[in-house]
């Protein structure tokens, strides 16, 4: 092994240790009793040895309103991901393939949305949703997440890379625009679709500020909001329970990133072209 490879290996090893050490520590603490954690949280090394080992924290978390929060987060994240993927793919196909009036003006305008913080729109969104009666509802939670300029950009770049001969051959065979889009272009755009879906699911699942503003009723809280409001003020008393909830809340996004990693990387690579 050359010196350069050895140096790269040790750099990567150190980076992995820096990243994994707090993760392993948090996982270990989540399997320790709350009463014990109140006395020993200042001892860093103690956290790596879950003795006595217990799953009581996970049971307590599920016995509260945790299942309601998880269900709300799943509904919001799945609905936002499904509709955003459809709308972004349609918009991307239109910008990449259809020569309509104003396309060269509208597309940069859409991309300009990447530079606008979402929090800047909370007041007008909250006012409009209040007038429409959409606050404290699942629709009101996921509807603002449907306008994603990033997804439109990824899909547009991907469709631009598909040879036009594919569409021309389909037109010769008698296919119309919708048939070309759903039967030809969408199957070819699976990597880009997965990229948009994973990024949007993670954003919707981890979103905190908008659900906090939009949903004031307890039964409409998402996972992040519920954990913050119910356990945040009692972190010292229920540290193990809080950490158990944190571990559970991160599992869906970690699973998606690991399982669909190859699609995600391909989609990002295409978006940089």
Indicate residue ranges for each PLM-predicted region.
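A structural signal for multi-pass alpha-helical bundles of membrane permease subunits
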Residues: 4-273
């Amino acid at each position: 092994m050359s010196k350069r490879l050895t140096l790269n290996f040790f750099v990567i090893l150190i980076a992995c240790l820096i990243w994994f050490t707090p993760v392993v520590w948090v996982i270990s603490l989540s399997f320790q009793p709350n009463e014990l954690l109140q006395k020993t949280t200042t001892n860093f090394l103690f956290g790596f040895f879950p003795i006595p080992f217990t799953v009581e924290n996970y049971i307590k978390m599920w016995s509260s309103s945790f299942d309601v929060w998880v269900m709300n987060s799943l509904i919001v994240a799945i609905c936002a991901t499904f509709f955003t993927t459809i709308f972004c793919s349609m918009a991307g196909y239109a910008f990449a393939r259809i020569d309509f009036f104003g396309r060269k003006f509208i597309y940069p305008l859409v991309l300009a949305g990447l530079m606008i913080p979402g929090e800047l729109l909370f007041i007008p969104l909250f006012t409009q949703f209040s007038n429409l009666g959409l606050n404290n509802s699942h629709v009101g939670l996921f509807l603002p997440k449907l306008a994603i300029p990033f997804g439109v950009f990824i899909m547009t770049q991907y469709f631009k890379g598909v040879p036009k001969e594919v569409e021309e051959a389909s037109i010769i065979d008698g296919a119309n625009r919708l048939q070309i889009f759903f039967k030809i272009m969408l199957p070819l755009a699976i990597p880009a679709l997965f990229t948009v879906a994973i990024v949007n699911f993670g954003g919707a699942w981890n979103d905190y500020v908008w659900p906090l503003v939009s949903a004031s009723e307890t039964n409409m809280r998402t996972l992040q909001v519920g954990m913050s409001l119910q356990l945040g003020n009692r972190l010292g008393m229920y540290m193990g329970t809080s950490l158990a909830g944190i571990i559970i809340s991160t599992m869906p996004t970690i699973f998606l990133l690991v399982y669909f990693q190859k699609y995600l990387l391909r989609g990002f690579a295409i978006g940089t072209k």
